[in-house]
Amino acid sequence: MMGIKTILRDKLRNAQRVAVLGIGSQLRADDAAGLLIAKELKTYLKDNKKRNQLKVFLGETAPENLTGQIKKFKPTHLIVIDAVDFHLKTGALRVVDIRTEAGVSFSTHRVPIGILRDYLYKSIYCETILIGMQPGSTEFCGCLSQGVRESTQAASKEIREVLKNFI
């Protein structure tokens, strides 16, 4: 299986403008994974000289509230990062083809990927890439699991390496 870095490089090959949308709740243990990665990327990119080509959005538990801002940015590609229950080992990462896995649900908000994809595509008109991380627990006020902690750090590093072309 290819790593996320290889897959992202391939999917972003013709990208002009990239938006990253982190989704999750810091109050629900491992559900915070997407949000934590996006926050790390936002910090890393704070001195980004090419802000017109790359922007990070923190969607938290209501990513649909940011569609206006994302639409205004006019990305050619949108990377969505969230905890997704694939029934895999805690911390496992997958780049999901949301055109074929429309029945998979996000871990806390339970919005099927297909519905979010259709909503984003109809309002933003861009290629959407989902990076999903398997949560161990989404318990309210729970702690981040070791597997998710390690995977968020590794994923942040790999995504940063791919996005270097845009900074």
Q: What kind of feature is each model-predicted range?
A:
Residues M1-P135, G142-F166:
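N-terminal catalytic or cofactor-binding beta/alpha core of small enzyme domains
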